[in-house]
From Swiss-Prot:
Domain of life: Eukaryota
Role, per record: Specific inhibition of calpain (calcium-dependent cysteine protease). Plays a key role in postmortem tenderization of meat and have been proposed to be involved in muscle protein degradation in living tissue.
Biased composition (Basic and acidic residues): 46-63, 248-258, 304-332, 342-367, 380-397, 443-502, 583-646, 691-713
Compositionally biased tracts (Polar residues): 85-94, 542-553
Biased composition (Acidic residues): 370-379
Organism: Sus scrofa
Keywords carried by this UniProt record: Acetylation, Isopeptide bond, Phosphoprotein, Protease inhibitor, Repeat, Thiol protease inhibitor, Ubl conjugation
Name this polypeptide is given: Calpastatin
Gene giving rise to this polypeptide: CAST
Phosphoserine modified-residue sites: S87, S134, S244, S367, S369, S376, S441, S517, S528, S575, S577
Region (Disordered): 1-187, 211-506, 536-713
Amino acid sequence: MNPTETKAIPVSKQLEGPHSPNKKRHKKQAVKTEPEKKSQSTKPSVVHEKKTQEVKPKEHPEPKSLPTHSADAGSKRAHKEKAVSRSNEQPTSEKSTKPKAKPQDPTPSDGKLSVTGVSAASGKPAETKKDDKSLTSSVPAESKSSKPSGKSDMDAALDDLIDTLGGPEETEEDNTTYTGPEVLDPMSSTYIEELGKREVTLPPKYRELLDKKEGIPVPPPDTSKPLGPDDAIDALSLDLTCSSPTADGKKTEKEKSTGEVLKAQSVGVIKSAAAPPHEKKRRVEEDTMSDQALEALSASLGSRKSEPELDLSSIKEIDEAKAKEEKLKKCGEDDETVPPEYRLKPAMDKDGKPLLPEAEEKPKPLSESELIDELSEDFDQSKRKEKQSKPTEKTKESQATAPTPVGEAVSRTSLCCVQSAPPKPATGMVPDDAVEALAGSLGKKEADPEDGKPVEDKVKEKAKEEDREKLGEKEETIPPDYRLEEVKDKDGKTLPHKDPKEPVLPLSEDFVLDALSQDFAGPPAASSLFEDAKLSAAVSEVVSQTSAPTTHSAGPPPDTVSDDKKLDDALDQLSDSLGQRQPDPDENKPIEDKVKEKAEAEHRDKLGERDDTIPPEYRHLLDKDEEGKSTKPPTKKPEAPKKPEAAQDPIDALSGDFDRCPSTTETSENTTKDKDKKTASKSKAPKNGGKAKDSTKAKEETSKQKSDGKSTS
């Protein structure tokens, strides 16, 4: 290594310290571009070399001999090291010598040359400043060359690698103005409408194609003689068949004649070509086709013509007038727009009045019996004979051989209501064989599980129940003609209305006992049946509707038949097996309704219920009633002491209930009163049973209050 190079290394390190390797690469590229600029402009470089030689003619004699040394040695390493040292010591001399040392570098493009030529002219004042700085940087490098380098070989190798990156250079922006020609952009944006976007922009040729697709008839072009189906098949199947070479001449003539017509036809439409009639015996190989046939087919199609490019500049935009939508009334839409000639004129009467259209006569609905008769005509053999036409001779022969029971072929469902008469051999019927064949094809009828089910209405009605008051439910709704006239007594009080009833004849005790004990006795004789009918009517009125007292039936009379004794013995044995009956504690309790109702009883004061509510007009009536009545309570007769049951005879105990029965007149009055009370309660009872009970309770409470008030007064 030269001493100048070793001295230049620390200088390069000092300069490289604050900069990044990316900047080094960038600067190295800038160093390479500068000699290219200088090579283009030779005059400034020659002047610059003269100046540098005058300033330092003796200090640096090496750079002039360096290019020749590098070219002779051919070593890249020595050339790079020298280039680094030259960049540090004399950058100005390096710019002038690099184009000579590197003649193999590629020449820049035309665009770069034009730019470098401009920059070289304006970069002269900046180069003088760089020369001054390079002179100052070379002075400390010479002073450091006297010091020995005590670095190892590894450090030297690293330094050599670092030197290959190139030394840093001060980059100063050139504040030069561009003096070249003005750059102009002649391009301008223009809107071009798409072809076919509007109907105006469609060319006439495309219009014809659209008309064909839409189905608009177009006049057919003038064609020569039309080809028949045989000629077309022959022309298409010539290439597919493998024919002898002698027939090639004929093919070419046919191709020439039919080629023009077949060009317009598409190949995809023809699915299979049949062999010509005169070549039916030849076998066509479908799997393998010769290349010549395919080439001939492709040649017959012709080459595809390129579509001519349309000049978009010739297309002019046409502004269409904005069409407004107007609704026009059609003739006949409204009555006003109908012309008078076409208006319907109603048929006029003699007086000028329009005649009403006659109502169509509706057919009367047929009754069930008429419908059944119409449906059963087919089953009735006598009516069918009249309707049937004259049978043919074949049917007569078949009927003579074997009559056909037609009733079996009819399904049971169709004969649910109508039962046909037993079948008889009739003329003109279907033969047995045909009916049996048809019946065999039908198969057996499966039993329908829904046949036995009752018919249900599947129609769901949306009718709601509405509670309407019936005529006569309330007193207000009773017409005045049907209202009961109130019977008043001498004092003006209304008397209760009594229904007139037929007087009941008095019955003797023996007659009543016989009527009651009739069920306990043996079977009645045939002569007494007529009398029992009379007794039942009389006894029904005598017997009270209240619960009958428990009575023990008397034993049958001793003059009974032996059959009755056997029955009694059997009954006794059964009664012994049952055991004694235990008394039920709930037997004597009054019957209570177990239905719980939510209706609450509301007590309302009625007029006259209390002394406060009695009007003064009716006060004197109550005072008269109180004066007339005795204040002493009615004395009750002392009841006779009852005898113990053990002391009484069983006959007296049984007949005691019959002795206590009231007279017939009293019983009849009691029954009539009971009936009146029940009818009154039924008519006044509301629909809810709870309200009726509440009203009865309220009446009992009011009656108690009245009795208490009277006693206190």
